[in-house]
Amino acid sequence: MSRHEGVSCDACLKGNFRGRRYKCLICYDYDLCASCYESGATTTRHTTDHPMQCILTRVDFDLYYGGEAFSVEQPQSFTCPYCGKMGYTETSLQEHVTSEHAETSTEVICPICAALPGGDPNHVTDDFAAHLTLEHRAPRDLDESSGVRHVRRMFHPGRGLGGPRARRTNMHFTSSSTGGLSSSQSSYSPSNREAMDPIAELLSQLSGVRRSTGGQLNSSGPSASQLQQLQMQLQLERQQAQAARQQLETARNATRRNNASNVTTTITQSTAATNTSSTENNQQSIQNSQFLLTRLNDPKMTEAERQSIESERADRSLFVQELLLSTLMQEESSSSDEDERGEIADFGAMGCVDIMPLDVALENLNLKESNKGNEPPPPPL
């Protein structure tokens, strides 16, 4: 209990250091050892103007305040996280905050939660007055008639043992230093260096556990119902989403079918239109070309000249036709004569008599008969 277990100095990075511990009430999870605090260590987020809560180990507290007496209204010395004033008790700190800083909404760390054992050392709140009223009310269950007595009392369950706040194994005590010396008034300190009664501590811990479990059960009730409601809402949303998806799919299928039919009809129409347009364009182009040729070829002339030219063209065409026909007929006749002559030559080569005209044959016969009459008879054999 002579070290701050689990705590390291954010300036020199020394862990589990001894002596006084100074916790910043503005910066989250920022602690300094005594030497760094006195030397004025700062960072980009921490300055020397930030209020600091001094926390002592149990050994240092026994060394400084062993044997002293404390009244009920003087537990410990706390620092105001808004103005940095020190020396307040729980009651006086609550009165000071409600009177001086009621309208302040800056996020600060509770010095009581940071100093008391079992409290949350980094409990940040933006309504410090309400936090003090709810969590750190003045103790009424102590025996006020005893007046001043030796400090051998337990910390109250509402101050950190009970509830959902995390526990710390080491016990810290606060002090306010004036002039280099630390003077402290503690709400929990073993007077005459006596250890805390283990039975009383166990009972207080059990009561805190019961309260925390009861709070958890009470909080779990509405959470379970809320979970059921959320599940029902999720199921309804899923069903609605599925129905919407089915509707969308049916609509998409219908639109796809309609689009397919429309596309086929449009394709046929477009092809027909393109064909007709292409034919029309071709005809127009042909007509335009004819018109252009006629315009270019036809000279400017009178009707008589045109008629004479047309008659000349007709005569020329007839002449050409007759010429072609005559050439074709001559070729056919010449070819037939040549064929006949060839055949006669072939007969002569074969020993056949040449074919001659009728008049020529008659003349030859007459000549032969006359010659026979003039010749002498042949000699007898």
Swiss-Prot record:
One of its GO terms (molecular function) is zinc ion binding. Residues 175-191 have a biased composition (Low complexity). Zn(2+) 2 binds at C24, C27, H46, H50. Residues 223-261 form a coiled coil. A zinc finger (C2H2-type) spans 78-101. Keywords: Coiled coil, Cytoplasm, Endosome, Lysosome, Metal-binding, Transferase, Ubl conjugation pathway, Zinc, Zinc-finger. It is found in: Cytoplasm; Late endosome; Lysosome. It catalyses: S-ubiquitinyl-[E2 ubiquitin-conjugating enzyme]-L-cysteine + [acceptor protein]-L-lysine = [E2 ubiquitin-conjugating enzyme]-L-cysteine + N(6)-ubiquitinyl-[acceptor protein]-L-lysine. The keyword Cytoplasm applies. SMART domains: ZnF_C2H2, ZnF_ZZ. PROSITE patterns: ZF_ZZ_1, ZF_ZZ_2, ZINC_FINGER_C2H2_2. It comes from the Eukaryota. Component of the SIFI complex, composed of kcmf1, ubr4 and calmodulin. Belongs to the KCMF1 family. E3 ubiquitin-protein ligase which accepts ubiquitin from an E2 ubiquitin-conjugating enzyme and then transfers it to targeted substrates, promoting their degradation by the proteasome. Together with UBR4, component of the N-end rule pathway: ubiquitinates proteins bearing specific N-terminal residues that are destabilizing according to the N-end rule, leading to their degradation. Does not ubiquitinate proteins that are acetylated at the N-terminus. This is E3 ubiquitin-protein ligase KCMF1.
